[in-house]
């Protein structure tokens, strides 16, 4: 099981050309890295330091950082990654990479958001995406009856924040987090739309799940690897402290970032089931993070005619497809808007994972298997031979 470069909503740098076939990031057998790891379009003088030991508290990373006074603006990670991000020059990064407690130092990448491509509401009684995932075949029957609501499950949206006052979320918004301080208020709208698809009363798959907003992107939709890791880190600690059944959605991504992939893996190991957007470049999803994480659920996008979206990424890192073209969901400030992208497909899977958890509580591998094994096979048009032909299905078999 396995990002989204949101062709429609997120625009990230393309990965560098390589003759090496792209492969998933396997949490069970991660790559051995050392020295300074390069990324595409790095932020000057910004690095992420990953320690050799497992996550165990911020004091460990802080003690390592303290030995290098040339590292400034230090932010430590405690739960999903053992390490810290900091500002330093290349020589300091190389020196820290040689420290006996350091596994590797990674350049920090940048993420930027582009203008959304919007569609028009069909004013259907049931959004077509919900209608499609509770039946095996077309035509749509204008109903959504999945047989579960996701009650008792907690859903975390790692994104631009949330309009918590939208009536679609009334009474179900739990504690959130923002890397910018204060409440995770959505200044863009993307996170609100995504959350509406996961768990909104009107547009949501799991209509009674509890919602947690995790803001890692600013109001322009811009973020960094370290800010996204901070979000994953917070989710991991919050879930450990509370012990409740959890799904998380990441409708974001960019070029390969081993540190981010490692953080997602550690969060999965802590009990969080992740759904991740595959990306919208019509390229191989294994070239992006965190869509290449094998143990997460990575979603491509399809339309209401069961055709794959022309923008959707492809390849073996995709687990299955979900509705991602002209998807109606909650809008910041109230009402709804219609958007397209694998950003829209992924939350359908996060909601379906919440339904699986509500029916049969279990660890992330069992939840992911519930989602993938229950998918409708060989019903989509335009799927390449290197990509699974599976369509999300939300009902219990």
Each predicted region: which residue ranges?
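The feature captures the short pre-catalytic strand/loop hairpin that immediately precedes
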Residues: 303, 322-349, 378-379
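Subtilisin-like serine protease catalytic core
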Residues: 125-126, 142-175, 182-227, 241-247, ...
